[in-house]
Amino acid sequence: MPLRRLLRASVPTARLEAVAEEVVHRYGGSSATFEKMEADNWLSVPLVVDDRWFVKVIADQHTLLHGVLTAGRNLGARSSGREGFFEHFSTPVEMADHELDATRAMRELGVDAPEPLAAFDHDGLGVVVLEYLPSFRTLDELSAEEISALAPTLFGHLSRMHGADLAHGDLRAENVLVAPDGDGEVGEVGDPGETGDPDEETLYFIDAARVQAIEDARAYDLACALASLSPHVGADAAVDAALERYPASSLSPAAEFLDFVSLRPDHDFETAAVREAIERAA
């Protein structure tokens, strides 16, 4: 989209080079070479530095846009008769710190996520440094059969977070990664700290907003999960996967957020089909 390209181009290359050099200086890499990643990301410029680190560079314009999107999301939540639960951050480094904390919180719960290394300010830019998963695929790059097999794990991750009174807050296909177990350090859900079999694949969450998981935020997460899965596996199969981790009574509140979620440009699903599948399950 033109606006996204403008935002990505708005951080001069020289400033990105300086960030890459700082990352290598801090972590002892062999080269400050970097590559911009093509990602559906409005709120940072994502880089891969030295083929070792995933770095998100956040500028003032990203913070401003985050404020606009946050206001819109909270307005949308209120239009669904719910309290707004998205938090705005006033500076790039606040956004960076929040993402680092959210990623740490997920891993502490046994939810697979790239290892968080640091968040810092560099010349007014917010910088987040995470481990890089070189062989990852996003959820929408998988086959329907692969998505169907991984759907219970996705809801298992959400259930762990919700059980600890946390929510993801921005669950969509590009924020769900699948990579060989050998790429990361967490392994399967429930076995943090163990490296898995490289012939197997693990589902990772990224970019969690880590909103406080009041009931409405949990319902919103579930609505986003169903919106992400149903185009690939069908509404009934997506709901069935959710029911492996959640009671049917938890899905009814999610149905109230489907119209709101459908307005997001990063979700494209049949709202009526998902709502009907939830009603059948109930």
Segments the model singles out, each with a brief description of its role:
Residues 1-10, 149-150, 157, 183-198, ...:
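Terminal disorder- and signal-encoded targeting elements
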Residues 115-125:
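Short beta-strand micro-motifs within the conserved protein kinase catalytic domain, predominantly
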Residues 122, 131-132, 137, 167-224, ...:
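Catalytic activation segment of kinase domains across protein kinase-like and atypical kinase folds
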Residues 42-95:
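ATP-binding glycine-rich loop module of kinase domains
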Residues 200, 204-281:
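C-lobe/activation-segment region of protein kinase-like
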Residues 1-42, 259-275:
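Juxta-kinase regulatory segment immediately upstream of eukaryotic protein kinase catalytic domains
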Residues 60, 77-85, 127-144, 210-211:
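A glycine-centered beta->alpha junction motif in the catalytic cores
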Residues 96-97, 102-113, 136-174:
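Conserved kinase catalytic-core helix
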